[in-house]
């Protein structure tokens, strides 16, 4: 029986899954929006939300904990200097997952994962 198993395996080894979510988290922090498949997006939420929660309190311990999960100095700096303060008043739910149709090659359901309250690009501010 499969009772109490949490999380999707996504047909990957644990190391591959961990690396994939690490790369997705760094990309999300850098661009504040990523495109991926719907199952990956839903599973990714479980990885990204706790990182932003840790970034709300800027301490050396939290920075080291986040760095141990991301392994990217620029991403950690942006997370603690920009994103943490941005979501200070929000008690969770920092991501929005939007369905965006199906991929042309294999008909996989696609999704956009974006940070809430993200600033619009300069071209759309008019």
UniProtKB/Swiss-Prot annotation:
GO terms for biological process: translation. One of its GO terms (cellular component) is cytosolic large ribosomal subunit. GO terms for molecular function: structural constituent of ribosome. Keywords: Ribonucleoprotein, Ribosomal protein. It holds the Pfam family Ribosomal_L17. HAMAP family: Ribosomal_bL17 (MF_01368). Part of the 50S ribosomal subunit. Contacts protein L32. Belongs to the bacterial ribosomal protein bL17 family. NCBIfam families: L17. This is Large ribosomal subunit protein bL17. It comes from Nitrosococcus oceani (strain ATCC 19707 / BCRC 17464 / JCM 30415 / NCIMB 11848 / C-107).
């Amino acid at each position: 029986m499969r009772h109490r198993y949490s999380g999707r395996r996504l047909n990957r080894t644990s190391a591959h899954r961990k690396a994939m979510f690490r790369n997705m988290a760094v990309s999300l922090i850098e661009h504040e929006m990523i495109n991926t498949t719907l199952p990956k997006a839903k599973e990714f939420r479980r990885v990204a939300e706790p990182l932003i929660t840790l970034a709300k309190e800027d301490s050396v311990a939290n920075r080291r904990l986040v760095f141990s999960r991301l392994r990217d100095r620029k991403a950690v700096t942006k997370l603690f200097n920009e994103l943490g303060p941005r979501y200070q008043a929000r008690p969770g739910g920092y991501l929005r997952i939007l369905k965006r149709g199906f991929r042309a090659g294999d008909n996989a359901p696609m999704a956009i994962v974006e940070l809430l309250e993200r600033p619009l690009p300069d071209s759309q501010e008019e």
